[in-house]
């Protein structure tokens, strides 16, 4: 089976469940974010958005690297921001391809694709992921 890696600033929401999880038959979502892993209040809201058919787990970035993924299911690892992905690969996490989707507009950001806006620092980080870590970057709001 496979593991899909995504950056989504909204983390878990209707598009995640209704489109991404259905398209790739995902039965487990891991949210890799140090702050959220410790925030029980915020986690509760995300758990409400997920159907019981999908297992949702919140881990620190380091814990998500060391996590033994069930090879019999499709899993999605979601990062809230590109900084989390940089931390993941610097800690020896392996990512061949990551999908950037739902990174909102803000001051100094430019549109890279539908729903994905990056500032200069974000672009530099994407370049580091590509050049230094060999990560294939895909800009995609919705699955095909």
Predicted regions and their residues:
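Short coil/turn connectors at secondary-structure junctions
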Residues: 1-2, 25-27, 72-74, 93-95, ...
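General beta-strand structural signal in soluble alpha/beta enzymes
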Residues: 5-7, 31, 57-59, 98-100, ...
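Short secondary-structure boundary/capping elements
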Residues: 9-13, 56, 121
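Ordered, amphipathic secondary-structure segments that act as subunit-interaction surfaces
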Residues: 59-102
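Glycine-rich, aromatic-bearing surface loops/beta-hairpins
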Residues: 82-83, 91-144
């Amino acid at each position: 089976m496979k593991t899909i890696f995504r950056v989504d600033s909204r983390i878990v929401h209707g598009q995640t469940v209704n489109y991404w999880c259905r398209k790739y038959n995902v039965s487990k979502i891991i949210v890799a974010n140090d702050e959220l892993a410790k925030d029980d209040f915020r986690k509760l809201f995300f758990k409400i958005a997920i159907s019981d058919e999908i297992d949702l787990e919140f881990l620190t970035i380091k814990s998500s690297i060391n996590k033994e993924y069930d090879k019999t299911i499709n899993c999605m690892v979601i990062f809230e921001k590109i900084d989390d992905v940089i931390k993941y690969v610097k800690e020896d996490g392996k990512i061949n391809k990551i999908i950037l989707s739902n990174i909102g507009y803000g001051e100094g950001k430019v549109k890279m694709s539908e729903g994905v806006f990056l500032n200069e620092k974000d672009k530099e980080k994407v370049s580091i992921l590509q050049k230094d870590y060999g990560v294939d970057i895909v800009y995609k709001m919705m699955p095909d």
